[in-house]
Amino acid sequence: MKALGARSAFYVGFLVGTCSLYLLLRQAGFTRDSGSREPGTHDKTLLEMLEEENKNWKKERSALFNLNHPHHTGEDGALADSLYKRVRILCWVMTGPDNLEKKARHVKATWSRHCNIVVFISSVDNPDFPTVGLNTKEGRDQLYWKTIRAFHYVMEKHSDEADWFLKADDDTYVIVDNLRWILARHSPEDPVYFGRRFKPYVKQGYMSGGAGYVLSKEALRRFVEGFRTKVCTHTTSVEDLAMGQCMEKIGVKAGDSRDTMQRETFHPFVPESHLTGTFPKTFWYWNYCYYPIVQGPQCCSDLAVSFHYVDASHMYLLEYYTYHLRAFGYKYRYQPPEPNVKAPEKVETRVLEQKDKVEAQEEENQSPELNDKL
């Protein structure tokens, strides 16, 4: 018994001593770390970052409305801010329940903050994220059906709140400010859409689904009307090709999204594939691109708009390269023409006039009820 008691006392003492040493070292380490940092330089907690991020969004009708155009304090973003107000872009992102944490949340935290409105389209509703559920199945064979339903949804819910309507996947990275520069030269009242232009099967070409594509307000209206009149139908699961065939039938032009030096802005692969990769001559890509393919540094515009197959970590890398990294002492080598923002400005005036007419009509419709009450 004495041996057992002595052994128990030893273990208890060892445990108490170990715990005391751990607490002492932990406190010493905390003090040392705290002392080595300047006041106010502590890293933000995850909770603080999330709270700061949420301040930029207003959640309404299962959509996220940006409350301001994000850019760095002290940075001259006057032109970007002006375009943000005049060239209003709704971005809807194709995702699914299994991809919200793996992919969609990284889109939400990076490039989508530069859209005016963001809608995440899924097969089921998720009010917390939020996503709009279209009661569709998941899978590649459902892509065009989800696309049809999504454009109908944004037409019904948000047609007066944006001028352009961008479709992107949850593994597509988009530089929305560069997209505004392209769109500012065009009126949203013109039937046109832009993206990475492919050429087979459609006379005027069609836009790559993975690189994303953007419809003008008039193109969106015609697309929805095309299904009502059965000019367009859901006959294939190949989303981008079917979209292009429908666009041609309803008189929506496939626009040229290249910059003034004829360099591509929408890209169906990650940057390194275009910059350093060599596509085999047997690769389908050579036969699909509407314009000649250029590999290497001239592959991509300095004002590139999108890249596809971008994983979560590369979302943040591209965000850093685009909005943070600068080489000291250099001016931009590419001086693009100033965007013409007059056309969207006129459209905004027409939209306001239309809203006034609608409000006046609503007042007339309500007046008999008011008279009855009086």
Swiss-Prot record:
Main location class: membrane
Region (Disordered): 355-374
Lumenal side: 26-374
Cofactor list: Mn(2+)
Catalyzed reactions: an N-acetyl-alpha-D-galactosaminyl derivative + UDP-alpha-D-galactose = a beta-D-galactosyl-(1->3)-N-acetyl-alpha-D-galactosaminyl derivative + UDP + H(+)
Membrane topology qualifier: Single-pass type II membrane protein
Binding of Mn(2+), residues: 169, 171, 308
Residues annotated to bind a glycoprotein: 284
Annotated GO biological process: angiogenesis; kidney development; protein glycosylation
Alphabetical keyword list: Disulfide bond, Glycosyltransferase, Manganese, Membrane, Metal-binding, Nucleotide-binding, Signal-anchor, Transferase, Transmembrane, Transmembrane helix
Residues spanning the membrane: 9-25
Cysteines paired by S-S bonds: 91-115, 232-246, 299-300
EC identifiers of the protein: 2.4.1.122
Cytoplasmic side, ranges: 1-8
Cell compartments where the protein resides: Membrane
UniProt similarity note: Belongs to the glycosyltransferase 31 family. Beta3-Gal-T subfamily.
Subunit structure as annotated in this protein's UniProt entry: Homodimer; disulfide-linked.
Function: Glycosyltransferase that generates the core 1 O-glycan Gal-beta1-3GalNAc-alpha1-Ser/Thr (T antigen), which is a precursor for many extended O-glycans in glycoproteins.
Stated name of the protein: Glycoprotein-N-acetylgalactosamine 3-beta-galactosyltransferase 1-B
